[in-house]
């Protein structure tokens, strides 16, 4: 760089001030200054530095300052527990002289480990989601594979001895909105003796160098301590994409730790199932893909499953749809995902409300009282056309709150909502998913 940029100058000033505070023994102040300096240096590398030589020089300085910051962090942490001799700049802290025993016997007393495990406690699902297998329409193959991997080993452990072992890694992949996360909720409900960890990338990615892989390690450690356990990682592609030259060092280290922990070398991974979900399985790293022994394609629902979804989403709401209507809706929604059908039904449920809003006439009808549904009354008001016998000209603002009887959801409401809702899955993505299934997966 021909001239020093303001950000680079700021980084140099911060690093210089950090070194001064370090020498003066103000280690907490020095630690903060080192960390701020590194942030400025990294900004310069990413957005301002010209030429590989300049970048290499700045990266070397960053490594040096980060190493010193880690030592100060370790020293300050130990100082809280007991009085220690201050470290001189450039000298290893007492903790470093003992060597890195993070995998040793004393790890259980490590406050850093406890802090990381406390962070992960929020990922444990304490309250079971109330989703049963029967609430999941279709996907029989996926349900059977999950029962085989999760429910059977808990209920009949004697079946899985010797060479017959349950699956330890299952990948659910398919278009968005097909029920992958919903299936995981059903697993959490049905496997009521298991500890269920629901993880997203934000739970495992930290801004501090080296902390993300520690979080991954501690996640698996927690799972081993709470066996039988299920680790569900939604959108796993955001954590375990293919390795490339462009990815950051932090991402590479997280991936490596995942591979080590899923392989389970030197540790007992019995009783732990890793359940992953993704919409774009082709971006997964090949080594991660291999760790998932079962790779199950969750396709778009079949017509009978789509018909069942319309029923499930309508629930107990008053409607006039017949079995034939549900079958017709199932046929008309080819290419729609479960999430798309959910949106169609939600929109259809609003159609009676819109009729109330736009009505210019109401008529009196007989129906259940709002105060006591078992008691029928004759003075309820429902929207009607101006030509209906008994039509009264009024708007919804004139209707008393406890006297409105909204129209039931009808087939015409469903068809109107269907015409306004387009599928969210395109043909190109489906072809890629089918190709991946042919190469690596199995049908769900």
From Swiss-Prot:
Main location class: membrane
UniProt membrane topology term: Peripheral membrane protein
Keyword vocabulary terms for this entry: ATP-binding, Cell cycle, Cell division, Coiled coil, Endosome, Hydrolase, Membrane, Nucleotide-binding, Phosphoprotein, Protein transport, Transport
Residue stretches making up the MIT domain: 4-82
Mutagenesis or variant effect for residue 15 to D: Reduces HIV-1 release 2-fold
EC number: 3.6.4.6
Chain residues that bind ATP: 174-181
Annotated phenotype, changing residue 210 to A: Impairs HIV-1 release
InterPro entries given in the database record: AAA+_ATPase, AAA_lid_3, ATPase_AAA_core, ATPase_AAA_CS, MIT_dom, MIT_dom_sf, MT-severing_AAA_ATPase, P-loop_NTPase
Purpose: Involved in late steps of the endosomal multivesicular bodies (MVB) pathway. Recognizes membrane-associated ESCRT-III assemblies and catalyzes their ATP-dependent disassembly, possibly in combination with membrane fission. Redistributes the ESCRT-III components to the cytoplasm for further rounds of MVB sorting.
Family, as annotated: Belongs to the AAA ATPase family.
Protein name (Swiss-Prot/TrEMBL): Vacuolar protein sorting-associated protein 4B
Organism: Homo sapiens (Human)
């Amino acid at each position: 760089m021909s001239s020093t940029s303001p950000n680079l100058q700021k980084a140099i000033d911060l690093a210089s001030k950090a070194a001064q505070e370090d020498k003066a023994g103000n280690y907490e102040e020095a630690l903060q200054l080192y960390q701020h300096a590194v942030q400025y240096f990294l900004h310069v590398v990413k957005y301002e530095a010209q030429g590989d030589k300049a970048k290499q020089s700045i990266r070397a300085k960053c490594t040096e300052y980060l190493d010193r910051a880690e030592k100060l962090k370790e020293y300050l942490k130990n100082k809280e527990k007991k009085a220690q001799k201050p470290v001189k700049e450039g000298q290893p802290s007492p903790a470093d002289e003992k060597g890195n025993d993070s995998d040793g016997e004393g790890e259980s007393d490590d406050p850093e480990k406890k802090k990381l495990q406390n962070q992960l406690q929020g990922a444990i699902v304490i309250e079971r989601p109330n989703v049963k297998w029967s609430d999941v329409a279709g996907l029989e193959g996926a349900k059977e594979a999950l029962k085989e991997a999760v429910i059977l080993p808990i209920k009949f452990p004697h079946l899985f001895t010797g060479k017959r072992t349950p699956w330890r890694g299952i990948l659910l992949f398919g278009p968005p909105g097909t029920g992958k996360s919903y299936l995981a909720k059903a697993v959490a409900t049905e496997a009521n003796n298991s500890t269920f960890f629901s993880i997203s990338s934000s739970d495992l990615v930290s801004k501090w160098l080296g902390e993300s892989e520690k979080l991954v390690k501690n996640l698996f450690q927690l799972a081993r301590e709470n066996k039988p356990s299920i680790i569900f990682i939604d959108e796993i592609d955001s954590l375990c994409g293919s390795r490339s030259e462009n990815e950051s060092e932090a991402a590479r280290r997280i991936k490596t730790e995942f591979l080590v922990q899923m392989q389970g070398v030197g540790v007992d991974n019995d009783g732990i199932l890793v359940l992953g979900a993704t919409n774009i399985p082709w971006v997964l790293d090949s080594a991660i893909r291999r760790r998932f022994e079962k790779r199950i394609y969750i396709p778009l629902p079949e017509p009978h499953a789509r018909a069942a979804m319309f029923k499930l989403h309508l629930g107990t709401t008053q409607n006039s749809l017949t079995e034939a209507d549900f079958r017709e809706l199932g046929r008309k929604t080819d290419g729609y995902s479960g999430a798309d059908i959910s949106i169609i039904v939600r929109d259809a449920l609003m159609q009676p409300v819109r009729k109330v809003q736009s009505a210019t006439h109401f008529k009196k009808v007989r129906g259940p009282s709002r105060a006591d549904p078992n008691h029928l009354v004759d003075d309820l008001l429902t929207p009607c056309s101006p030509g209906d016998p008994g039509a009264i000209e009024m708007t919804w603002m004139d209707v008393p709150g406890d006297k409105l009887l909204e129209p039931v959801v009808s087939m015409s409401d469903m068809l109107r909502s269907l015409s306004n809702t387009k599928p969210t899955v395109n043909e190109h993505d489906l072809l890629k998913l089918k190709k991946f299934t042919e190469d690596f997966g199995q049908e769900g």
